[in-house]
Amino acid sequence: HLCGKRILLGMNRPIERQGGFAELVSIPDKNIYELPNNLDIKKAPIAEPTAVALHAVELGEEALKKPLNKTKVLILGGGAIGLLCGLILEKYKKSNEIILVDPNEKRLKACKSHLNSKTLKPDNSLIKDNYFDIIFDTVGLEITRQNSIKSVNPGGVIIHIGLTQPSGTFNFRKATLQEITFIGTYCYTNEDFEKTLNLLSNKVLGSLNWIEYREMNKGAEAFKQIHDGTCSTPKIILIPS
C-alpha cells in the first residue's frame, strides 16, 4: 500500500489505470482472496472499505500508544468509512466514548441505528475544543481538518483518511506546540485485508444490513444523490442487471 508505483483500477494516482467499471479485468492471482464460506458474495464488496477503516483504526491505536477502549474518539463523516470506523471501534476495539459527526440528518439517522455511539451534527456543543484523544477525518475537507485540530487534545492523534479537498489552511502552530500526531492513511496491507475477511465472516461488525443495493442502470442517480447530500445510506452497491 506504500508502493510508489501502486496501481488501482479506476484511480489515476500514482499511476493512471482506468477500468473500475469494466465487465472483465485481469489482475495477478496473488491479489485474489478466496471468499470465506460465511460471507455472502453480495456483502463481500464491503471488505475493501472495511480494510481501509481497520488499517486507519490500528494506525491510530499504535500512534496513541494506549488501548482505544480508554480514549475519547471523534469520527468526522458518516459515510461507509466513517461508519465502519465506528463499528470497528465499538465492536472490535470495545471503545465506549465515540462521537460520529455528519451534517446530513438522514445519514446520521442511518448511522445511529447501527451504532451505540452519539451521532451529532457539526455544530453540537458536545464537540468540544481540545477534548478528543483521537480523531478520524473520513471526509478530508479544509473545514474538517480545521475542526480536527481544534477538537484534538494536546498530545492527541489525527488520522486523515478523506480526500475531498487536497489542500487548505491548517493550524500548524497548535500541531507543533501541543505535539499533535497527524497521520495520512490510504488503503491497507495484506494482513489488514485477511483480518477484515475474518471479522466479516464471523459477523464481528454486525449484520451489515445498512448496505443498500441498486441496479447498475441506477448508478448515475445514486452518484448524484451522494454528491447532492440527499442519500441516507452510507454504502450503495450496484448489481448488474
Q: What are the language-model segments listed below?
A:
Residues 1-32:
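Glycine-rich phosphate/adenylate-binding loop and adjacent beta-alpha elements
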Residues 22, 70, 131-132:
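Local beta-strand N-terminus motif with an aromatic residue
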Residues 39-122:
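Mid-domain Rossmann-like dinucleotide-binding core that forms the NAD(H)/NADP(H) cofactor-binding site
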Residues 75, 136-137, 160:
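Redox-cofactor binding/interface segments in oxidoreductases and associated redox assembly factors
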Residues 117-124, 213-218:
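Short acidic-hydrophobic, aromatic-tinged amphipathic segments that line or gate anion-handling sites
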Residues 126-135:
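A short acidic, Gly/Pro-enriched loop at the edge of an enzyme's catalytic core
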Residues 143-202, 239-241:
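Glycine-rich phosphate-binding loop and adjacent beta-alpha segment
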Residues 146, 190, 194-241:
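C-terminal hydrophobic helical "lid"/dimerization subdomain
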